[in-house]
């Protein structure tokens, strides 16, 4: 029985990982128990048929929260506790430590931990195993906090349930993105690229999925490029895959991603993708599609060239590229294969 604990407020890659891997492990005969703040995370877990409970975490080390997890872990005979951020470790992690339950710290970004006393003390006292989303993320964390190199530290790629092989092209073609609406995610460069392509007479539509702290700013960036009439902002959606199914071309405009879970979701849906050559993205990129990786600090000019090429390709040629990305997803992060890897690692721990 595995507890997945996540106290973060925003939806991020680790939450998607928890739900996907929890469901896959449940189908392999394990029990999955999800704990999160009131909101979409526990609700989505329940929709997937997982056991889920809303938790009000309070401050780090909150004795009431620790007591709650002590009761829960005893009640459900939890064998492994998987946490995300420090608050998870300093509540559920402490409860797991008292009960002798192995703890895993699931990390999704090189900046998740700082080299400071609180990090050292938590790592020393709780002794969690560490699990990163990519080799890039793992290496970055060890550079930031050298002591982590002394611990059991694995890197296992994220995973998805894969639909059928892509077989359709929309008319007009649809460009879609789904990363968080944050000023650091590079949406302005994507909108600039779309503007340049539109000026060349290319007809297309754009869908921007999700929300974030700078949603209004991103919408203003879209308006400033004259794209309001062809762009749809969906806001928060509970089923990202359904939205991705409406697209043909996916753009990940982020300047740097530890792996790019949004990109993996798009590849798993069989979309032709454009991203920056940075972070962990090259680890999962199809070897034959290097021309669709633009420079890390591109202002949108190279992105415009990549978009123009995909939007004007003959249908069969674009479909072939979509199939390349889908094939890489099948090869690299099919949920059943990743669940097997995680299961094997968990058995070694337990």
Where do the language-model regions lie?
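Conserved acidic donor-binding segment of nucleotide-sugar-dependent glycosyltransferases
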Residues: 287-301, 309-315
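A short, active-site helix/loop in glycosyltransferases that binds the activated sugar's phosphate group
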Residues: 127-152
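Short His-centered aromatic/hydrophobic patch
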Residues: 83-89, 107
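A conserved, positively charged/aromatic
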Residues: 103-131, 146
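Aromatic "clamp/platform" in nucleotide-sugar-dependent glycosyltransferases that forms part
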Residues: 236, 255
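A conserved mid-protein helix/loop that constitutes part of the nucleotide-sugar donor-binding site
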Residues: 12-20, 173, 180-196, 202, ...
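Short hydrophobic beta-strand element within catalytic cores of glycosyltransferases
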Residues: 34, 272-275
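Nucleotide-activated donor-binding/catalytic signature segment of Leloir-type glycosyltransferases, i.e.
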Residues: 219-235
């Amino acid at each position: 029985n595995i507890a997945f604990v996540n106290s973060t407020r925003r939806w991020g890659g680790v939450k998607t990982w928890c739900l996907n891997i929890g469901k896959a492990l449940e189908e392999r005969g394990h029990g999955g128990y999800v704990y999160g703040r009131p909101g979409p995370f526990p609700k989505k877990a329940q929709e997937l048929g997982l056991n889920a409970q809303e938790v009000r975490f309070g401050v780090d080390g909150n004795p009431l929260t620790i007591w709650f997890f002590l009761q829960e872990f005893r009640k459900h005979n939890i064998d492994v506790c998987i946490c995300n951020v420090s608050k998870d470790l300093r509540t559920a992690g402490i409860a797991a430590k008292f009960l002798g339950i192995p703890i895993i710290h699931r990390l999704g970004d090189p900046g998740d931990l700082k080299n400071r006393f609180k990090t050292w003390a938590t790592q020393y006292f709780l002794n969690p195993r560490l699990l990163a989303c990519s080799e890039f993320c793992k290496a970055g964390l060890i550079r930031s906090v050298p002591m982590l190199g002394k611990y059991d530290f694995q890197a296992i790629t994220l995973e998805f349930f894969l639909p059928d092989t892509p077989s359709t092209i929309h008319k007009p073609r649809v460009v879609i993105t789904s990363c968080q609406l944050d000023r650091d995610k590079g949406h302005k460069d994507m909108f600039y690229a779309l503007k340049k392509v539109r000026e060349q007479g290319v007809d297309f539509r754009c869908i921007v999925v999700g929300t974030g702290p700078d949603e209004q700013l991103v919408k203003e960036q879209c308006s400033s490029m004259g794209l309001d009439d062809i762009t749809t902002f969906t806001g928060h959606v509970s089923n990202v895959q359904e939205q991705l199914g409406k697209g043909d071309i996916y753009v990940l405009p982020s300047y740097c991603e530890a792996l790019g879970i949004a990109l993996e979701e798009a590849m798993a849906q069989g979309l032709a993708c454009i991203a920056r050559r940075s972070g962990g993205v090259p680890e999962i990129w199809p070897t034959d599609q290097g021309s669709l990786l633009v420079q890390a600090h591109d202002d949108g000019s190279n992105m415009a060239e990549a978009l123009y090429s995909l939007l004007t390709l003959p249908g069969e040629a674009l479909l072939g590229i979509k199939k390349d990305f889908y094939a890489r997803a099948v090869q690299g992060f099919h949920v059943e294969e990743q669940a097997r890897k995680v299961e094997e690692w968990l058995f070694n721990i337990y």
